[in-house]
Amino acid sequence: MLSMSPIIHSLLDTDLYKFTMLQVVLHQFPQTHSVYHFRCRNLDETQYPLTDILDDLNEQLDHLCTLKFKDDELQYLRSFRFIKSDFVDYLELFQLKRRFITAGIDEEGRLDIWVEGPMVQAMMFEIFVLAIVNELYFRRIRSDAVLEEGERRLQAKLALLEQYQTQHQSDEPPFLVSDFGTRRRYSFEWQKHVIAAFHHHFPNIFRGTSNVLLAKELNITPIGTMAHEFLQAFQALDVRLRDFQKAALETWVQEYRGDLGIALTDVVGMDAFLRDFDLYFAKLFDGLRHDSGDPYEWGDKAYAHYRKLKIDTKTKMLTFSDGLNLEKAWELHQYFKGRFKVSFGIGTNLTNDMGQTPLNIVLKLVECNGQSVAKISDSPGKTMTDNDTFLAYLRQVFQIAEEEPVA
């Protein structure tokens, strides 16, 4: 019995790309075993130790593992042309297993969460766990003053969008913003409040949300394709390490046949990605997603690559999703609007801009089929692995320089 209200009420309360990736895993490599590990990147900025929420977290995880998909939720998923009927049949039977996740305290006294089990189970924990940790943490420091400040900041964002809408020329590519903030949200209710306000006031700017439940409830478009874990898994599957990105992209193409065509570029950095992103993939994929490194430099590299392949960049989409706010998004739109279609996924700044320091938390894939996997980000400090030896080998294979140590 929960001692407080449940945070997750529905298995749809997660990001769309969890479903799109899970479908490929189920169809292409269902026996894959995986390990995920939790990390808070800004422990020194928390108002109290995250370990204080451990008992409540375990209660919430117990509850999460009782949930199943409801009939109307399955019908909603069935309505998307890229979701196959056999996948919905699988989801009808789906239930997260409590034995695959453990939450405790590590040797250094930090909150320690591990997920270990079949990837078709394990990958679905991530967004739920991060949302639960966030909401438990902020529940303890919630006040009317915090909510009032959050509302003030929301109204300022709406006023800024009004200004941008006035400045936008009708013959320019649209300024498109989506909510990518489920994993770092203040609470479910706050995320819904923010999304509803954006959708109501700016339906031509607000493109949708990554959150499938909120997309269903508010009748807006769910947004998402793939995350790092999908590409990383191929580092441990039956392909040469040097070929893992090409294998992942090819598998995606075979599954979706032209749908969900935005490729993520920073699993081993943009330069290494572009070496694999040949004419075949450049024509097949609708565009690219930026999630680390200098966005201007990244977009210019994408532009030069498409030009070299003699592809009209105005037919391609650049999606930016790294630490954005509306001001940064508008500046990027102004810079790239003459060359690309552009869109922006804004996370923490939309769903947890309350005047308190947000948690910078992740639950990342670190092992697949008993073998380490890694991400070598374009941003120092976002690289993640539990195996420095494998990380060094990955750098060598993809000719990536060692990054400066981050304190």
From Swiss-Prot:
**Native species:** Acinetobacter baylyi (strain ATCC 33305 / BD413 / ADP1)
Among CDD domains, the record links this protein to: PncB_like (cd01401)
This entry's Gene Ontology molecular function terms read: nicotinate phosphoribosyltransferase activity
Q: Please state the Enzyme Commission number of this protein.
A: 6.3.4.21
Superkingdom in the source lineage: Bacteria
Task: Specify the enzyme's EC class, one word.
Answer: ligase
Per its UniProt record, what SUPFAM superfamilies does this chain match? Nicotinate/Quinolinate PRTase C-terminal domain-like, Nicotinate/Quinolinate PRTase N-terminal domain-like
- NCBIfam families documented for this protein: NAPRTase (TIGR01514), PRK05321.1 (NF003704)
The Phosphohistidine modification is found at 228
Protein's pathway: Cofactor biosynthesis; NAD(+) biosynthesis; nicotinate D-ribonucleotide from nicotinate: step 1/1
Name of the protein described by the UniProt record: Nicotinate phosphoribosyltransferase
Supply the gene name.
pncB
A GO cellular component term found in this entry reads: cytosol
GO terms classed as biological process = NAD biosynthetic process via the salvage pathway
Which Pfam families would you find in this protein's record? Answer: NAPRTase, NAPRTase_N
Q: What is reported on the regulation of this protein's activity?
A: 100-fold more active in the presence of saturating ATP.
User: What role is this protein assigned?
Assistant: Catalyzes the synthesis of beta-nicotinate D-ribonucleotide from nicotinate and 5-phospho-D-ribose 1-phosphate at the expense of ATP. Functions in the deamidating salvage pathway for production of NAD from nicotinamide. Displays a strict preference for nicotinate over nicotinamide substrate.
Stated family: Belongs to the NAPRTase family.
Catalyzed reactions: nicotinate + 5-phospho-alpha-D-ribose 1-diphosphate + ATP + H2O = nicotinate beta-D-ribonucleotide + ADP + phosphate + diphosphate
InterPro entries of this UniProt entry? N/Namide_PRibTrfase, NAPRTase_N, Nic_PRibTrfase, Nic_PRibTrfase-Fam, Nicotinate_pribotase-like_C
The knockout note for this entry states: The nadB-pncB double mutant loses the ability to grow on minimal medium supplemented by 0.1 mm nicotinate, but it can grow normally in the presence of 0.1 mm nicotinamide.
Spell out the post-translational modification annotation for this entry. Answer: Transiently phosphorylated on a His residue during the reaction cycle. Phosphorylation strongly increases the affinity for substrates and increases the rate of nicotinate D-ribonucleotide production. Dephosphorylation regenerates the low-affinity form of the enzyme, leading to product release.
Among HAMAP family, the record links this protein to: NAPRTase
Which keywords does this Swiss-Prot/TrEMBL entry list? Ligase, Phosphoprotein, Pyridine nucleotide biosynthesis
